[in-house]
Amino acid sequence: MAKVQYMGTGRRKKSVARVRLVPGEGRVIVNNREIETYFGLETLRVVVNQPLVLTETKDKYDVLVNVHGGGLSGQAGAIRHGISRALLKADENLRPELKKAGFLTRDPRMVERKKCGLKKARRSPQFSKR
C-alpha cells in the first residue's frame, strides 16, 4: 500500500520550496541534509518549525523538503509557507490558526530593481554643492 503523504509548495523572495509531509516522528530534512546542518542559525530553524509548533503536529510528521533559489532567510520563509500549505491538505481544520498567524499568505515583497543614474534602488550619488 502506498504511503500517505501531503505536498505543499512555498515561495518567498526568489526561493521555492517543495515540501512533503510523511507520517513519522518529527524529523526535518532539507535537500537531503538534517535541518541542523543546513540552517546554522537557530532563528532560521525556529522559522521553519513555526507552523508545526503552532498546530502541535511536530511529532506527527517527517518533513522532506527540496528548496532552491535565494538565500537562507528566503529559503526558511519558503519552507514555512510550504509546510503550512501541506498541513492544510492533511487537515483543513487547521486553517483558522494558520491564517491568523499569517503562514498561509505569500509575502509579496521582492527586491526593488536598481535604477540608472542611482547607486542602488533608491540611494542617489553624493551631492556636492561646489
UniProtKB/Swiss-Prot annotation:
Pfam families: Ribosomal_S9 (PF00380). GO terms for cellular component: cytosolic small ribosomal subunit. Keywords: Ribonucleoprotein, Ribosomal protein. GO terms for molecular function: RNA binding; structural constituent of ribosome. One of its GO terms (biological process) is translation. Gene3D superfamilies: 3.30.230.10. This is Small ribosomal subunit protein uS9.
